[in-house]
Amino acid sequence: MRVTQEFYELLRNRINISDVVRQKLALTRKSSNYVGLCPFHQEKTPSFTVSDSKRFFYCFGCKASGDVIKFTSNISGLSYNESAIKLANDYGIEIPKLTVKQKEFYEESDNILNILELANKFFRTQLTPEILNYLNQRNITETTIKEFSIGFSPRNNKFAKFFLDKKIDITTLGQAGLIGKRKNGEIYNLFSNRITIPIRNIYNKIVGFGARVLGNGLPKYLNSYETIVFQKNDTLYGEHKAISSSYKKNRSILVEGYFDVIALHQAGFSEVVASLGTSVTENHLHKLWRACDEIILCLDGDNAGIKASIRTINLALPLVNSEKKISFIRLPSGLDPDDVVNKNGADFFAKLIDKRISLSEMIWYIEYSGKNFKTAEEKANLEKNLKDYCNKISDSNLKASYYRFFKDQIWQNLVIKQKKIITQNFNSSLIASSHCYSELEMLEHAFCALLIKFPIMLAEKDIRDFILNLNFNNKSLEEFRNWYLNEIIDNKVEESEITAIVEKTSFFDIFLLLSKADNLFLDISFNKNNIRLDLLWQWLYKKYYLINLQQEYAISINGNHDFEKVLLYKKEILKIVNELQVLNESFINQTIT
């Protein structure tokens, strides 16, 4: 009795793999998984791991791995299909009968799979010394050639004759994606004069081929045409080998090319797959996330690789969360993974994995690295782009973390590290010449920015008195505060007239810096339209109080031995830090809901 692929997936989703495994061996809970003594080899220390969330088992000892159906097959000696039927009967799951169309589909699928196996056997027999020498120059060993079934499709008519002798016609070869048709109607061997690499699905069945031209012809790589058994948006090269390793290491490495997978696998990185030269799809990501929690993208270090990274980032952002992650390996410019591992060795590539950067760090690298942000327009565009990325994230907690991360990066890289903050169009003087700001000076700027951006807050006498009585470290800002309160706020100058008045004073540069639409000194959130002023004031006030507390604490621990006083300072500091954290969460949650 034949069942559909959809029914296999139904069984994986409906039946907890741990329930099935527990019938054959004792399992002990370990974190989110279960462990026990492997039923497939003798061992004294449990190395057999089962994960209900990933619907997978893996033995660290004998390397046995698979889903609930594969476990049943291995235990019982039944085929995969027979094991699925057994599980369905055991758990009372109805097995749907195949429709006439489904039967025809599976008959055609089986026929295509058989033809592809025959084609691979033919290609394997056509390896010549020239081809083997080429592969050897690429550091591909004889063992690897056999393991990946690398072959060759000659230019002559041997390919067509091979299938004609087996009574397989041109139409059937076309259904298998093995031949092409020219504009003039001529039929030709799709992979003529190319090295062939079989593409296998997760069940180790050949579903298509990739092929590389000998020499410098174009296109360099070809894939089989899509068929009923082969869709590029759902298939990953190397997935049949990588899934168990991905489960073991809790990561998958996603590259672009066949030879990237082969070279990395040969170097010991068996958790590697490739996207068949096409853009990464949502199906690809979900397939890998079922086996692991982290997908590491390792794309070429050129402009095309960066563009591919951006496409994948935009695809992944709505899907990622605190558990399912994307990270990136940044390769040396102009090199692909195959080049890197062959020129620098496995240890070098392992270090690149260790130095991988997170998705948020990759976004910052793409948007910030190698660019100038001298003008307000450039900075505003950067903030807009970062905000657009954040808004694509579905997970609210992760979105909040991204907002915080980018805010911090903007502050660290566009304020503290910049020697000039105001654009070159203005004759910056007092502020722009400073090399960096202390935390206290940052707050002094923020208090002055309040006067400009939220003058309504000064209706609160306590707030006005606090700002008015502050002793600024930056005396230029203090003078600006006094002048602005007296000349603008107290005189109730209309907003439309303020710029013209300030322009005639020595405070114009300061005013320009503080009055920008997205002022960094008040950039607790990216969106100021619905800002809660009470939260903003509490945050600024408590931050100012904390900095002064920390300064007094530093003096107390260095200047005397009043331990009771020191402990009081420490307790108060921790209290304010916690209160600020709560305010941070409130602020960000407000902006993203």
Swiss-Prot record:
Which InterPro entries does the UniProt record give?
A: DNA_primase_core_N_sf (IPR037068), DNA_primase_DnaG (IPR006295), DNA_primase_Znf_CHC2 (IPR036977), DnaG_bac (IPR030846), DNAG_N (IPR013264), DnaG_primase (IPR050219), TOPRIM_DnaG_bac (IPR034151), TOPRIM_dom (IPR006171)
Q: Where are the zinc fingers (CHC2-type)?
A: 38-62
Which is one Pfam family of this protein? DNAG_N
Q: What's in the keyword line of the UniProt record?
A: DNA replication, DNA-binding, DNA-directed RNA polymerase, Magnesium, Metal-binding, Nucleotidyltransferase, Primosome, Transcription, Transferase, Zinc, Zinc-finger
Going by the record, the broad EC class of this enzyme is transferase
Manner of cofactor binding, per the entry note: Binds 1 zinc ion per monomer. Binds two Mg(2+) per subunit.
Question: Which GO BP terms sit in this record?
Answer: DNA replication, synthesis of primer
Which residues are Mg(2+) 1-binding? 256, 300
The residue ranges of the Toprim domain are: 250-332
Which family, according to UniProt? Belongs to the DnaG primase family.
Domain remark in the UniProt entry: Contains an N-terminal zinc-binding domain, a central core domain that contains the primase activity, and a C-terminal DnaB-binding domain.
* Identification of the protein by name: DNA primase
Query: What is the native source organism of this protein?
Result: Rickettsia typhi (strain ATCC VR-144 / Wilmington)
Gene it is expressed from? dnaG
